[in-house]
Amino acid sequence: MRIEEFDYELPPGQIAQQPVEPRDASRLLVLHREGGFLEHRHFYDLPRYLHPGDVLVVNETKVIPARLWGYRAGTGAKIEVLLLTRQEGDTWETLVRPGRRVPVGAELIFGRGELQARVKGVTPAGGRIMEFSYQEGPWEALLERLGEMPLPPYIKEKPADPGRYQTVYAREEGSAAAPTAGLHFTPRLLKELREQGIEIASILLHVGLGTFRPVKVENIQEHVMHAEYYAVTPAAAATINAARARGHRVVAVGTTVVRTLETVATADGVIHAGSGWTDIFIYPGYRFKAIDSLITNFHLPRSTLLMLVSAFAGREKILDAYRVAVREGYRFYSFGDAMLIL
């Protein structure tokens, strides 16, 4: 398939710059795959589409203040560093700008010198492997003080509350970007779903370069995903498998959940607990094993995320739904509105 098959026109004014308040007041475009018809709702209407016994699977990853501003020792050149994946100890895979100023062996200084880094290598994707050093920890406290929340470049203004770029159920630190489908949930809505008999299972996928790396090839099958860390507990696997065995639906909250479950599922849809790294790339033609419904935001043109939802619902149905969403004034991308694909 060609990359241009996943293009669409979006007026810049429909790229959401701030989240709505409350979270579940965002709009919800419901796409019924069977029949292809659409409904216009709000996210707080979600309970009417779920049934007792269904299991909602969420990603409990937490975004870290992964953007650091520093300078190169010796030259004073200003350098931007985005932490992607922790490898071992204080060694991280990172993206740097401008890359030409950061060769192997370069030393970087952050803050007033309380955090330093040495470039140990270059990744195939053009990133840098950096080993950080500091005299006074802990690391998390240093990041909180020196780092910034790594908002996507299309968001031009910081949210008044940085916590709005976290889900209310975020637990495990490690992501360079939020699993945005989950941003619409409130504690009240989760409570309502539980009281309705909806099971909620938590998995983990730390969002890194694999989720938002642009596709630079014409033939999408040639694109190579960057690996991201995932974990599925025995309890989560048991909850999901029990729901499916009883004939209930597995509803994935976001593409990160889809990629995790499809990674650990057998051919007949049984979920196995475990952890590791996944570089699964889902595009039209893929046969889903693990999920029945999907909650997701509106994604960028030509992105792997748009390809994934097109694989699930059909490319034409998705692009038709996007055209309707544009016409009806829906808000797009990370702080935008949501879709429920049934």
Swiss-Prot record:
Catalytic function, reaction form: 7-aminomethyl-7-carbaguanosine(34) in tRNA + S-adenosyl-L-methionine = epoxyqueuosine(34) in tRNA + adenine + L-methionine + 2 H(+)
Biological-process GO terms, alphabetical: queuosine biosynthetic process; tRNA wobble guanine modification
Keywords of this entry: Cytoplasm, Queuosine biosynthesis, S-adenosyl-L-methionine, Transferase
Principal location listed in the UniProt entry: cytoplasm
InterPro entries linked: QueA (IPR003699), QueA_dom1 (IPR042118), QueA_dom2 (IPR042119), QueA_sf (IPR036100)
Top EC class of this enzyme: transferase
This protein's pathway: tRNA modification; tRNA-queuosine biosynthesis
Nuclease listed as a keyword: no
EC number, as in UniProt: 2.4.99.17
SUPFAM superfamilies per UniProt: QueA-like
Organism domain of life: Bacteria
Any one annotated GO CC term: cytoplasm
GO molecular function annotations of the record: S-adenosylmethionine:tRNA ribosyltransferase-isomerase activity
Tagged with keyword rRNA-binding: no
Protein's UniProt name: S-adenosylmethionine:tRNA ribosyltransferase-isomerase
Species this chain originates from: Moorella thermoacetica (strain ATCC 39073 / JCM 9320)
Gene name of the record: queA
